[in-house]
Amino acid sequence: MGRMFGTDGVRGVANKELTADLAYKLGKAGAFILTEGTHRPKILVGMDTRISGDMLESALVAGILSVGAEAICVGVIPTPAIAYLTRKYNADAGVVISASHNPVEYNGIKFFNKNGYKLSDELEDSIQALIRDDFKDVPVLTGENIGRKIEEDGEAIRDYIDFAKSTIKGDLKGLKVTLDCANGASYITSVEAFKELGAEVHVINNKPDGININRNSGSTHPEDLMEYVVKNNCHMGLAFDGDADRCLAIDEKGNLINGDFILAICGKELKRQGRLKKNTIVVTVMSNLGLDIAMKKEEINTIKTKVGDRYVLEEMLKNDYAIGGEQSGHIIFSDYNTTGDGLVTALQLAHIVKESGKTFSELCSIMKELPQVLVNAKVPNDQKDIYLKDEEIKSEIDTITKNLDGSGRVLIRPSGTEPLVRVMLEGENQKEIDKLAHGLAKLIENKVK
């Protein structure tokens, strides 16, 4: 059995890879490992709008109840809401059934510990080991020792909306905004929060039918939102993904504003308020070099981690940083939540736009994005480290880096899932870096033939 857990829980095609049987086992093992020693543990369960959610929830909950835990089912709700509410309700753990931005046929199961954090690799390995060993030493409970399922009546959504609203001071009156809910988990929470704060709210893709989640919508397909914002003279647009743990934005001119710009704008504002701890933001190695340059001008440090919001969070927790995130729109505000939170990000950004008295595009001028080229080099899995060993490749990387002279960079990343090495170049001249990236990728491929 290979490693079951990926970077964001267990994911696969529902009913084929992520079966009801596997969901039952994950519920049983997760509840047992995360609540060991607790008298009558309670586990919060939420999901996105996928048609397979009901099937997987039934199986997952059966597993949870079989080891004596209570399952509090809150229905369709954003992933970050489960992280927040697990803490607020003093639950022993939280589980979300979602495959985030993936197409409808996929689904996933992701656990949070009692403090609202994603699980460590060690805990995930313990859950997998219990399943692999066929629940050896897990007692079979009967009678009154079996757990109960508790259907929650909407209070959870209300509590999450109130929490998200409390993260900004004042209101959003006078702001005209369009929200793209990706027909996903934010179709109630984000709309209500913005309306209650006084914004003029337009909404698209907020009619989930179980199969239209992420379909030509949300943060992975913002084209309709870009058009809508311009056509309706909105101050800004905000796009969520299926489980609303990320948010991308659109300025009033219809330009897509990614996570790098959001981090730059929010980082600068936190510094102005004296809340940017150690004057530092945390980003990944894939963030644009333009962000580094912009932050340097603002006297803000950038710390870089491996790709993945879990690594960003790890760095933030280690050094008590206030904000971090990824280009994809996973932004973590550690003062507010323990994971990427699309609604909290959207509200922070909207509030800054309103209070600044500037247009959104003017605020985005803080940063100039450098052209970026990504080329895949086909490399066998056992030779993915060739770029670290081969002298000619190393020499070529050094030459390119030297010629870019601080206004560009070379980044090489082996794929974690495919026989590929990704060659990424940034620089001021698109044509030049395109040529250099393809040349370097070809050199790497030729070396493994």
From Swiss-Prot:
<keyword id="KW-0413">Isomerase</keyword>
<feature type="binding site">
    <location>
        <position position="245"/>
    </location>
    <ligand>
        <name>Mg(2+)</name>
    </ligand>
</feature>
<dbReference type="InterPro" id="IPR005843">
    <property type="entry name" value="A-D-PHexomutase_C"/>
</dbReference>
<feature type="active site" description="Phosphoserine intermediate">
    <location>
        <position position="100"/>
    </location>
</feature>
<protein>
    <recommendedName>
        <fullName>Phosphoglucosamine mutase</fullName>
        <ecNumber>5.4.2.10</ecNumber>
    </recommendedName>
</protein>
<dbReference type="GO" id="GO:0005829">
    <property type="term" value="C:cytosol"/>
</dbReference>
<dbReference type="InterPro" id="IPR006352">
    <property type="entry name" value="GlmM_bact"/>
</dbReference>
<feature type="binding site" description="via phosphate group">
    <location>
        <position position="100"/>
    </location>
    <ligand>
        <name>Mg(2+)</name>
    </ligand>
</feature>
<comment type="function">
    <text>Catalyzes the conversion of glucosamine-6-phosphate to glucosamine-1-phosphate.</text>
</comment>
<keyword id="KW-0460">Magnesium</keyword>
<dbReference type="Pfam" id="PF00408">
    <property type="entry name" value="PGM_PMM_IV"/>
</dbReference>
<feature type="modified residue" description="Phosphoserine">
    <location>
        <position position="100"/>
    </location>
</feature>
<dbReference type="GO" id="GO:0000287">
    <property type="term" value="F:magnesium ion binding"/>
</dbReference>
<dbReference type="Pfam" id="PF02878">
    <property type="entry name" value="PGM_PMM_I"/>
</dbReference>
<dbReference type="GO" id="GO:0005975">
    <property type="term" value="P:carbohydrate metabolic process"/>
</dbReference>
<keyword id="KW-0479">Metal-binding</keyword>
<dbReference type="Pfam" id="PF02879">
    <property type="entry name" value="PGM_PMM_II"/>
</dbReference>
<dbReference type="InterPro" id="IPR050060">
    <property type="entry name" value="Phosphoglucosamine_mutase"/>
</dbReference>
<comment type="similarity">
    <text>Belongs to the phosphohexose mutase family.</text>
</comment>
<dbReference type="GO" id="GO:0008966">
    <property type="term" value="F:phosphoglucosamine mutase activity"/>
</dbReference>
<dbReference type="GO" id="GO:0009252">
    <property type="term" value="P:peptidoglycan biosynthetic process"/>
</dbReference>
<feature type="binding site">
    <location>
        <position position="243"/>
    </location>
    <ligand>
        <name>Mg(2+)</name>
    </ligand>
</feature>
<dbReference type="InterPro" id="IPR005845">
    <property type="entry name" value="A-D-PHexomutase_a/b/a-II"/>
</dbReference>
<dbReference type="InterPro" id="IPR005844">
    <property type="entry name" value="A-D-PHexomutase_a/b/a-I"/>
</dbReference>
<dbReference type="InterPro" id="IPR005841">
    <property type="entry name" value="Alpha-D-phosphohexomutase_SF"/>
</dbReference>
<dbReference type="InterPro" id="IPR016055">
    <property type="entry name" value="A-D-PHexomutase_a/b/a-I/II/III"/>
</dbReference>
<dbReference type="Pfam" id="PF02880">
    <property type="entry name" value="PGM_PMM_III"/>
</dbReference>
<keyword id="KW-0597">Phosphoprotein</keyword>
<dbReference type="GO" id="GO:0006048">
    <property type="term" value="P:UDP-N-acetylglucosamine biosynthetic process"/>
</dbReference>
<dbReference type="InterPro" id="IPR016066">
    <property type="entry name" value="A-D-PHexomutase_CS"/>
</dbReference>
<dbReference type="InterPro" id="IPR036900">
    <property type="entry name" value="A-D-PHexomutase_C_sf"/>
</dbReference>
<dbReference type="GO" id="GO:0004615">
    <property type="term" value="F:phosphomannomutase activity"/>
</dbReference>
<dbReference type="InterPro" id="IPR005846">
    <property type="entry name" value="A-D-PHexomutase_a/b/a-III"/>
</dbReference>
<feature type="binding site">
    <location>
        <position position="241"/>
    </location>
    <ligand>
        <name>Mg(2+)</name>
    </ligand>
</feature>
